[in-house]
């Protein structure tokens, strides 16, 4: 199991989460998010993997943020194509692709990303991007047949 805490911005929170033993820490680079990180915090975790969360961002901007923040993985919440994911992965970044799930048929959208991404994140379907804090019916995942 991997424990990831997302939406980190404040140095004291970053230190506390790192000391609590989180494996991964997420930084949101989506300007419409209340937890958007507009600049590099005074402190970045040294013991947690740093994850950059992006929505419909250009590969160029993703790579700039990856370098600035020393990201290990990128988490993609938008309409990123398998080809964009493949090219980003080729740079050495781990790629996490997010899929919104409301019903079993939503799992099919992951198929063309199989073998391209390192991880899939299945999230509750909602009107916006990112987590809603609400669980979906996890029994739906029993129908998932992918390997990622």
What are these regions (language model features)?
Residues 1-148:
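Conserved N-terminal beta1-alpha1 strand-loop-helix module at the mouth
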């Amino acid at each position: 199991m991997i424990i990831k805490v997302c939406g980190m911005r404040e140095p004291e929170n970053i230190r506390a989460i790192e000391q609590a033993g989180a494996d991964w820490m997420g930084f949101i680079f989506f300007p419409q998010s209340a937890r958007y990180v507009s600049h590099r915090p005074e402190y970045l975790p040294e013991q947690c993997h740093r994850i950059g969360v992006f929505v419909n961002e250009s590969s160029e901007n993703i790579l700039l943020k990856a370098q600035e923040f020393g990201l290990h993985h990128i988490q993609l919440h938008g309409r990123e194509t398998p080809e964009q994911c493949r090219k980003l992965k080729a740079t050495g970044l781990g790629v996490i692709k997010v899929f919104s799930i409301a019903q079993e048929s939503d799992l099919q959208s992951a198929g063309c990303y199989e073998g391209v991404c390192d991880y899939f994140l299945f999230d509750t379907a909602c009107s916006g991007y990112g987590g809603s804090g609400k669980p979906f019916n996890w029994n739906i995942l029993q129908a998932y047949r992918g390997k990622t």
